[in-house]
Amino acid sequence: MVGPTERELAQRWPLIMATCMGIISSSFVLPYYSIGALLTPVTEEFGWSRAQFQAAILFSSGLGALTSPLIGWLNDKYGPRRVALPSLIGLSIGLLTASQIQGDLWMLFLAYGMMALLGAGTIPVTWTRAIATSFFKRRGLALGLALTGTGICASVAPHYTVWLTDQFGWR
């Protein structure tokens, strides 16, 4: 006989998988783990120093830290779906902007700023809220499984980004 604990996991595993994928694609995860593979091709093409390039990441991180409490509040008020979906579009706009950089350093800062601000609703707090409100007996396990998205991205994104860059260029 399957108890309520096992049923909870069996019935809601798609939510765990969706949360894991959401965390992988978040503005706090994917851009940070793929940036190392882009450092050399971008800095060589535009003649920027590593410090200039990495400053855009610092800028984005600062914006992310400032917006996190607001995103938590928005999740409480509107729910994760209404926060995440528009933010995924915003994050995509930021990524598209990054692909159009023509050598102006301010464009890099703009693109990473857009990823941080417009994609702010994709941060893990949004995705994990769905887990926290849907699981009761196995909430910790469900959160742990969902948060493996960060480790998966850290393991896969750099290698995949290098391969994509080799095949198609950094844009």
Residue ranges of predicted features:
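Pair of pore-lining "gating" transmembrane helices in MFS-fold secondary transporters
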Residues: 11-34
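Hydrophobic core of transmembrane alpha-helices in multi-pass small-molecule transporters
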Residues: 24, 94, 105-122
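Residue-level signature of mid-helix packing/kink "hotspots" within the transmembrane helices
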Residues: 33, 61-69, 154-155
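Intracellular juxtamembrane helix-capping segments at the cytosolic ends
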Residues: 42, 119-135
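Helix-to-loop junctions at the C-terminal end of transmembrane segments
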Residues: 67-80
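C-terminal ends and interior cores of transmembrane alpha-helices
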Residues: 89-103
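Helix-loop-helix hairpin linking two adjacent transmembrane segments in secondary transporters
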Residues: 150-171
